[in-house]
Amino acid sequence: ISAICEIVDGFKWKGPIGCGFPGVIRSQIIETAANLGGRNFVGVNLAEEIGRACGCEAWIINDADAAGCAEINFGIGKDRNEGVLIMLTVGTGIGVSMFSNRTLVPNLEFGHLRMRDKNIKKYVSAEKICSDAARKSHDLSWQQWASRFNKYLEYLYSLCWPDLIIIGGGVASKSEKFLKYIKVDCDIAIAKLENRAGIIGAAYEARKHF
């Protein structure tokens, strides 16, 4: 919060603040925060805390949802008015947002879907085997990683039947290395807004709500 206030003070900002958070948010209350240890955040109204500290209205949104809101309003999905769209933010983890006819279905947390890791013969979080961090830690070639990632996309497709899957996050800038190996029965596109998507989406949602 102190870092946010420092930015606000630096720009002499008086408008609303948007903040992406890696967890489930309901009515601005944090419900989960697994990637941050959880206990110090769960049950906290982070919007109120930030607003009180910075002297501005604040709006909290799941970080993957923020990235998706940016891409559907200002990026590759802006001309898609109908159908189901999924936005993936693939980097240290996997963030997932979904829109039905441009309406956000919040807090999916589909990066934590359970998938079978054939190496250890156990079911683990998809992030553990399909994120870019997993590619690096297991020293996988792009083709090897794409094979894993494609299974994850097929799993998502079987659950949600999307018309379009947008791939963003850190891997998006390396799409020429893996996209040719991706075979899913829907449109696949690379995000336009790159790592700015979460920032843009959080700001957009804050402005929309205030």
Give names to the regions the model predicted.
Residues 1-17, 25-32, 48-58, 70-90, ...:
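ATP-binding/phosphotransfer module of carbohydrate and carboxylate kinases, centering on a glycine-rich
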Residues 19-24, 38:
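Small-residue-rich anion-binding loops in enzyme active sites
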Residues 61:
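Generic enzyme active-site microenvironment
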Residues 30-43:
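A charged helix-plus-loop insertion that forms the helical arch/lid used to bind
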